[in-house]
A protein has these predicted regions:
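Bacterial N-terminal signal peptides that target proteins for export
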Residues: 2-13
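Ubiquitous "structural anchor" signal
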Residues: 5, 19-21, 187-189
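Extracytoplasmic/secretory-pathway segments with low complexity and glycosylation-like composition
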Residues: 27-252
Length: 252
């Protein structure tokens, strides 16, 4: 599962990262070159979504906005795909110019300079609900910055209410549920269904209208990998249909 890179396209939740925990089985033998928990203070990265001619099964494209990097240092751009460590260097040779932008000077200078904020990065086939990370790092990796997005979110809305699930298991067994837009302090009914099992409980919404975050876990009891998560309040009812297990890991 790589990333596209061309003149136009280069193919990324603290609690979620804690739930993933350490080095996943799929990357057990990959060196840990960059650690998001050790980002350089003052360095800021943001992935800004841009419209692309994609289908619903494809991830969107992003431009990378960077601030706080020093001059006189060479930087590289890295990506981290779900289930792996940072090991894919997309491009190197960026420097901060007099305007504060990262610029890549082509060999020979035939095509002129290329600015990082004009490039578009796009992960290839990617699981729903999984996060994608991009990093900018100095050549010696002492200066680093990170940005995280969920290219294909699992989210549903009803009026002002929204509920989302983030994939936090490399086996597709756990999802982090969160919600917003509910009536402050109201009691809502949270229901999880999969493989004939039903779990139902009451949760209290915060004063800010947020649903308490919780981990939704799954265990194999049949071949059915379809699941449903719903939250019902006084004025809205939000339902999410999704897949879990190996079916959740497919980038389709």
């Amino acid at each position: 599962m790589g990333a596209r890179f061309s003149p136009e396209i280069a193919s990324g939740c603290v609690l979620a990262l804690m739930l993933l925990g350490g080095v996943p089985p799929t990357s057990a033998h990959e060196p840990v070159l960059l650690d998001p928990n050790r980002a350089t203070p003052g360095v800021r990265l943001e992935l800004v979504e841009v419209p692309l001619a994609t289908t619903g099964s494809e991830a969107p494209g992003y431009r990378l906005a960077v601030a706080g990097l020093p001059t006189g240092v060479v930087f590289s751009v890295w990506t981290k795909h779900f289930g792996h460590s940072f090991h894919e260097e997309l491009h190197s040779g960026f420097r901060v110019d007099e305007t504060g932008k990262l610029v890549l000077v082509q060999r020979g200078g035939v095509d002129g300079p290329r600015y990082l904020d004009q490039m578009v990065f796009q992960p290839e086939a990617y699981p729903r609900g999984a996060n994608w990370q991009v990093a900018v790092a100095s050549a010696d990796r002492t200066i680093t910055g990170f940005a995280t997005v969920i290219p294909r979110p699992i989210v549903a809305r009803d009026g002002p209410c929204a509920v989302s699930l983030e994939l936090v298991s490399h086996r597709g067994l756990r999802f982090l549920a969160s919600g917003s837009g509910f009536a402050a302090g109201e009691d809502v009914v949270v229901e999880s269904r999969y493989s004939g099992r039903v779990s139902r409980k009451q949760q209290r919404v915060s004063a800010a209208g947020l649903l308490p975050k919780e981990v939704v876990s799954h265990a194999a009891v049949s071949d059915d990998r379809d699941a449903r998560f719903s939250v019902k309040g006084r004025s809205c009812e939000v339902t999410l249909d999704y897949e879990w297990g190996n079916a959740a890991l497919r980038g389709h």
